């Protein structure tokens, strides 16, 4: 099934577990407000909010937005004082549901999706005698934290979070998954 509204077509690659909302859909305003951790929500309104549940959802949402000539912004945890990810027009891709992670204690590495909170990841790492310099505020997700450089309280001792990353898998502006 394909759903078209306002020049952006979303089809079956967005699974039942994901959710797509246009401005006039039920749940849009609560999703827009929930895209920020603070209560002072800017008066900016994306044309569509896509709450993804998989990397495939992200790929599809980016490709659909590109095909429609729409700008894309991304939210992982919404811990942005300015709320710069909530823009007028375009598509807001909410990756906060992407919270899977795995830890390989023998190689001292972890793999984590962008919606996992740094405090959650750190707690799991510490159970295994490992550490990662996460943000100092509870609820800061690693996706946005890393995009901002990963500056936290432990930076002087351990470096920025970005300097502790071995590799990143990401979806580029064309909607292609890269490593």
Task: Give the residues covered by each predicted segment.
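Active-site and channel-lining beta-strand-loop segments
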Residues: 101-102, 160-179
